[in-house]
Amino acid sequence: SQSMLSFILNGISILALIFLMSSLLSYGSVSRKLNTANEQRFSLTYNANRFMNGSAYLTNEVRAFASTGQQEHYDNYWNEVDNLKNRDKGVEAMQKIGITAKEQAMIDQMSDLSNTLVPLEDEAMKNVQAGNMQAALDYVYGSDYNSSITQINAIKEQFLSDLDARTLAKVETLERNARAIEG
């Protein structure tokens, strides 16, 4: 009877040890997934802002060039377009991490609207170089330009809100899973 009691206690101890090891492995897995989800959330937000800030930078530089005629702003504009390419790099990084079809559609919408600004920006720069400062200002401060900027900003806000909600939900789910394993 004592050997039976030892056998039962040993069995219970082994089962408890197996359960403990399983819990530790599960917690480790969830913890790694949680760290990855947090890193991805940060990277997605960073690169979304990189994309949007690149676009805003181009607007600021073309407007500064139209206002002042200073070559520095013209050079900054084309350096962003030709070399830095923050918009493209931001989108590439987000796609590599993983975005939804809806998020990609919003990026495409913002890009399409941004591309409608290019002819206006081009005309503004040509007018500055020809000495027609008022015409240049009319291109980059006119209703067509401002309408596109307003639309881009509205999509941008929705995009950031959707991205934040999606990535936060993933993080919160993993946090709940971690607490369930701990608890």
Regions found by a protein language model. Name each.
Residues G54-S55, T68-D162, R166:
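Heptad-repeat alpha-helical coiled-coil/4-helix-bundle sensor or tether segments in soluble regions
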Residues R63-F65:
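Juxtamembrane extramembrane loops of integral membrane proteins
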Residues N60-E61, K170:
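Short, hydrophobic/aromatic alpha-helical segments in well-folded domains
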Residues T167-G183:
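Selective recognition of signaling/oligomerization transmembrane alpha-helices
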Residues S6-Y57, G98-L113, N177-I181:
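Amphipathic alpha-helical segments and their boundaries
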Residues S31-R32, Q151, A169:
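N-terminal sensory and localization modules of signal-transduction and trafficking proteins
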